Design a protein with these regions (language model features):
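Conserved class I S-adenosyl-L-methionine
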Residues: 49-58
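Short beta-strand element of Class I
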Residues: 72-77
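Conserved SAM/SAH-binding beta-strand->alpha-helix loop
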Residues: 80
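Conserved SAM-binding loop
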Residues: 87-88
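S-adenosyl-L-methionine
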Residues: 1-47
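Glycine-rich SAM-binding Motif I of class I
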Residues: 60-64
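Short conserved loop adjoining the S-adenosyl-L-methionine
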Residues: 109-114
Length: 119
């Protein structure tokens, strides 16, 4: 499947690059290709009993895909409030929304939950 087909299946909108807040300290929003996520999801490294922590989650593509593919729980961390709002908006329609949470915070200030098994 291509990028748009995966987004449609997962009922999210994550395609496209966003350079609006990029500078020498912050990367632009650029979603991880689904082909990479498919390989990771099929690797067996992330399982249903795992909790995944996704630093720089953007609009939540990694979180929604891997929670769909592996049934893991996922926590997405995003510092950009505008991009975070898009992730929350995606959660309203995503098919794996019940296993995904988002937090808007600078990663340096986030306390790692004890249940997190994969980062």
């Amino acid at each position: 499947m291509n990028e748009n087909e995966w987004d449609k299946l997962l009922k999210i909108h994550t395609t496209g690059r966003d350079d609006s807040n990029a500078d020498q300290y912050r990367y632009p929003y650029e979603p991880t290709p689904y082909s990479v996520l498919e390989r990771l999801g099929n690797s067996g490294w992330i399982r249903k009993e795992n909790t995944l922590l996704d630093y720089g989650c953007g609009k939540g593509r990694v979180d929604f895909f891997l929670s769909y593919q592996t049934r893991c729980r996922s926590i997405g961390i995003e510092y950009n409030e505008r991009i975070y709002a898009k992730a929350v908006e995606n959660k309203e329609t995503a098919i794996s929304a019940e296993r995904v949470d988002f937090v808007v915070v600078n990663a340096e200030q986030f306390s790692l939950p004890v249940e997190v098994a994969r980062i």
